[in-house]
Regions:
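Ser/Thr-rich, Pro/Gly/Ala-heavy low-complexity intrinsically disordered linkers and tails
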Residues: 1, 15, 408-482, 494
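Hydrophobic h-region of N-terminal signal peptides that target proteins for export
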Residues: 6-16, 483-487
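Acidic Gly/Asp/Thr-rich repetitive segments characteristic of extracellular carbohydrate-active
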Residues: 17-52, 378-381, 385-386, 391
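Right-handed parallel beta-helix/beta-spiral solenoid domain characteristic of secreted/periplasmic
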Residues: 18-25, 41-50, 55-111, 165, ...
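Right-handed parallel beta-helix
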Residues: 43-44, 64, 69-73, 90-101, ...
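Surface beta-loop-beta hairpin patches that serve as ligand-binding interfaces in beta-rich domains
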Residues: 332-333, 356-420, 425
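C-terminal cell-surface anchoring/sorting signal
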Residues: 480-501
Length: 501
């Protein structure tokens, strides 16, 4: 009887281990031999990665596999390979270290992380990711039975993501590139200084697209440029839909003959600060039922609800420029304050184009003007909004001042051998003046906020251009002048949704 009881308890016994690593070889071995519940700890130092590190063992909800630095940002992974870390199994967490792309050719450093297929519930937390074309790439993979496996429920939280110079590549440049997958949350991050010096000259801070659902962007600080360099390229802040998806890569059909009519559904953008972009701060491309709530956009060309399947609501946003319905897009416009001059922001806040919205002047006109909408309970600083009527924008000024230089618990700059830095200006000519409205930043005009352009060799392919925004930001321009394989033995209940073939 005792023997039977012991055998019955065996599945509940944890085989998790604490594994400390000090070299790249030890790290590779620890990842390759990981067990559910393992905590892999990186000793301080530099780890040079010359081929992909693969994470193929499945963690569980109760026993995720954790990879973290012993000292926050004391460990730096230097990547000289196309993909530094590939995650194809669920329940992995990565915390407290830095990664830097060091490839001599920018097109050879695509991703710090590629999360694919059955890699649901992956967490990136308190990381500093520098100098990759797309620091995070998420995409579906063929399941082998005519369907596709998709990673769901990812979380990117309190990370700093940036480039030290424009990326000299024709490949997509999007700091967080999330294709397919439901219920992704991008929260409390600092995304800054991203630019593309090649191809279509279009870059994004982040987008979610390719048929995903219920994505959330909240309390992020996005600075398309933190320095004073001129922008002749096209930089877009946050997006549902990006530049669109070739139909063979879009849920639910994954069929070249079926258009990707909805790039994202039921997405939410709330309490974000987006500043200093040459194009729109928020771009919605075939994004059905999207909520844009209490964001502050300074020195951008506003918000676009674009194309016939884009619907939604915009409530309580504070911004330079306008919120537009374009090409049959529709939305309800409620208690937004638009057309605010950069000079008015500068009179109210310490350094708004640098993301510092510490109050230095009067903000009285913006306080108490919004009837609280559904879907929001706090502000950018994670403070509960309790007043009967709220301040417009990301900050609830009735609660007093709060620090906005970086998001709550977000990236801290410096440390780990990596320092924050400007993305620089894109050389090689202008492509038109920043004239607002339909004017053209390079690659723009009324042309393509594409986020795409060809395919990369990691299996995460991007479409050709879908003709997105590209309307340059007058406010930002004037401000410059004035100021893979997871072994599919069984499918647990939390595995990715499989689409029909």
């Amino acid at each position: 009887m005792k023997r039977l009881l012991l055998l019955a308890l065996l599945p509940a016994i944890s085989l998790a281990r604490d594994v400390r690593v000090t070299t790249e070889a030890e790290l590779r071995a620890a990842l390759g031999g990981a067990l559910p519940g393992d905590v892999i700890t990186l000793a301080s130092g530099t780890y040079v990665i010359t081929s992909k590190l693969s994470c193929t063992t499945a963690g569980t909800p109760g026993q995720p596999i954790v990879v973290r630095a012993e000292v926050p940002f004391g460990a730096t992974l230097e990547s000289n390979t196309l993909i530094a870390i590939g995650v194809s199994a669920p329940f992995w967490r990565f915390e407290d270290f830095a990664m830097r792309g060091v490839c001599p050719v920018d097109s050879d450093c695509e991703h710090a992380f590629q999360v694919t297929g059955l890699a649901t519930d992956v967490v990136l937390r308190r990381l500093r990711l520098v100098d990759f074309n797309a620091q995070l790439k998420v995409n579906a993979t063929p399941a082998g039975d005519g369907g596709y496996d998709m990673p769901h429920r990812g979380l990117v939280e309190a990370c700093e993501v940036f480039d030290t110079r424009p990326r000299a590549t024709a490949n997509p440049v999007t700091k967080l590139n999330i294709d397919t997958g439901d219920d992704f949350v991008v929260r409390d991050n600092f995304l800054h200084d991203f630019a593309k010096n090649g191809g279509n000259f279009i870059s994004y801070g982040s987008f979610m697209k390719s048929g995903g659902q219920r994505g959330v962007y909240e309390r992020n600080l996005v600075l398309c440029r933190s320095g004073g360099q001129a922008m002749t390229d096209t930089r877009i802040g946050l997006s549902f839909g990006g530049g669109g998806t070739a139909p063979q890569f879009c849920y639910p059909g994954f069929n070249a003959a079926v258009p990707c009519s909805v790039e994202h559904a039921d997405g939410v953008l709330r309490n974000n600060i987006v500043a200093n972009c040459s194009d729109v701060g928020v771009y919605l491309n075939r994004a059905r039922n999207t909520s844009v709530l209490h964001n502050t956009l300074v020195g951008t060309n506003g918000v676009d609800f674009r194309f016939g399947t884009t619907t939604g609501r915009a409530v309580g946003n504070l911004l330079t420029s306008a919120i537009r319905a374009r090409d049959l897009g529709t939305f309800t416009d409620t208690q937004n304050v638009t057309g605010v001059a950069v000079a008015a922001f500068a009179a109210a806040y310490a350094s708004p184009l640098a993301g510092d919205l510490s109050v230095t002047g009067s903000v009285t006109a913006w306080v108490g003007v919004v009837t609280p909408p559904s879907g929001v309970t706090d502000d950018y600083c994670a403070r509960t909004r309790a007043a009967a009527r709220w301040t417009v924008g990301a900050l609830e000024h009735s609660l007093g001042n709060c620090a906005t230089g970086k998001p709550p618990d977000g990236g801290t700059g410096g440390g780990g051998g990596l320092t924050g830095g400007g993305g620089g200006s894109v050389s090689g000519g202008g492509g038109g003046s920043a004239t607002g409205g339909g004017g053209s930043a390079r690659g723009g005009g009324s042309g393509s906020a594409a986020g795409g352009g060809g395919s990369v060799s990691d299996g995460g392919m991007e479409p050709g251009a879908v003709s997105g925004c590209g309307c340059a930001s007058l406010e930002s321009g004037l401000a410059v002048l004035a100021l893979a394989l997871f072994r599919r033995v069984s499918r647990p209940a939390w595995a990715g949704r499989k689409a029909p073939g």
